[in-house]
């Protein structure tokens, strides 16, 4: 079920784009004038590369899942980063909401598999951004420096095609 885009513009307990730090980050990262698509792409890369992926920092409290907390921490896991992307898009007037999927993570480390006791990531978070009359999926989880370290092809986002699952590797 696809939500009505107009329902994806308000702040929530998690998507707290009305927080001054989140609003400021959105203004800086959107890069000024441009189409919604151009600004959404800039916001995607700001979150993907400006917030470090950290699957060990999991705080499921309301405060721990807020976009403002993710921004304050400077790191987070897929759900955190997707929440922040939804928040900065909404702050820029671009409708965005959360999406979730169960994914088999072929990229995880032995330490992470032992911690989770599985290689299936339940409730993997991504952001659906409403552009040009439709939702486009974006996963800002793995930052560029992480991808380079593990020799993974980073997910690119152009605002026209879904960017949701990583290929195996380079």
Outline where the language-model segments fall.
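Secondary-structure boundary elements
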Residues: 2-73
């Amino acid at each position: 079920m696809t939500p009505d885009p107009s329902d994806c513009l308000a702040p929530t307990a998690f998507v707290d784009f009305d927080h001054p730090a989140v609003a400021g980050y959105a203004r800086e990262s959107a890069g000024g004038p441009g189409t919604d698509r151009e600004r959404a792409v800039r916001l995607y890369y700001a979150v993907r590369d400006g917030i470090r992926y950290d699957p060990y920092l999991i705080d499921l409290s309301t405060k721990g899942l807020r976009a403002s907390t993710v921004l304050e921490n400077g790191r987070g896991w897929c759900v955190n980063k997707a929440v922040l992307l939804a928040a900065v898009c909404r702050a820029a007037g671009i409708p965005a909401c959360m999406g979730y999927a169960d994914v088999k993570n072929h990229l995880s480390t032995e330490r992470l598999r032992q911690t989770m006791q599985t290689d299936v990531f339940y409730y993997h978070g991504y952001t659906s951004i409403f552009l040009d009359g439709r939702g486009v999926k974006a996963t800002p989880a793995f930052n560029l420096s992480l991808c380079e370290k593990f020799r993974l092809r980073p997910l690119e986002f152009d605002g026209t095609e879904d960017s949701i699952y990583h290929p195996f590797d380079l």
